[in-house]
Amino acid sequence: GIRDYYASRGLGDVYKRQAIDCPVYDYSNHNRSDKVQHIEPAPVLIVEGILPFVEPELCAMFDYKIFVDTDADERILRRLVRDVKERGRSLDSVIEQYLTTVKPMHEAFVEPSKRNADIIVPNGGENTAAVEMLAHHIRNLIEKANMM
């Protein structure tokens, strides 16, 4: 994803409003695929992921840093369903990975990175008031950019 692109080539092109071809991660093979996602410059660019606020250089490129916080139980349930149904993994392998890698890494990197956010949205995407407020602000930014 975009963090992989940043790590390997730098996010500077996106920041300078230049088009990029971003590598696509293949979760079934645990590696980058041969595919790329072409990203055109836009008045608003939304970078999503679990680690965008870990790197200070990356944080400095964002006008707004929004952390969508989701309950730990919800995160593990989503992971179980996704990895078993969509990625063909066994329940045991998902639980093992969660306990040995995902949970410790979340606690070591993701959770502390919330400090770098400008806004923390509790209750994930279920927080209708926050989602509507952010959508309204993003629409205003796009309209303002289109007037220039």
Protein language model regions, located:
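Short, structured coil segments at secondary-structure junctions
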Residues: G10, M61-F62, N116
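Glycine-rich, often acidic-flanked micro-motifs
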Residues: R9, K16-H38
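Anionic, Ser/Thr-rich low-complexity intrinsically disordered regions
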Residues: F67-V68, D73, R89-Q97, K103, ...
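NTP-dependent small-molecule kinase module
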Residues: E40, V81, K103-M148
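ATP-dependent NMP and nucleoside kinases share a basic, alpha-helical "lid"
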Residues: R32-R87
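A generic local structural motif
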Residues: G1-R3, N31-D34, L51-F53, H106-A108
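Short gly/ser/thr-rich secondary-structure transition/capping motifs
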Residues: V24-S33, L45-I50, T100-P104
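Single conserved hydrophobic/aromatic residue that forms the stacking wall/gate
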Residues: G1-Y15
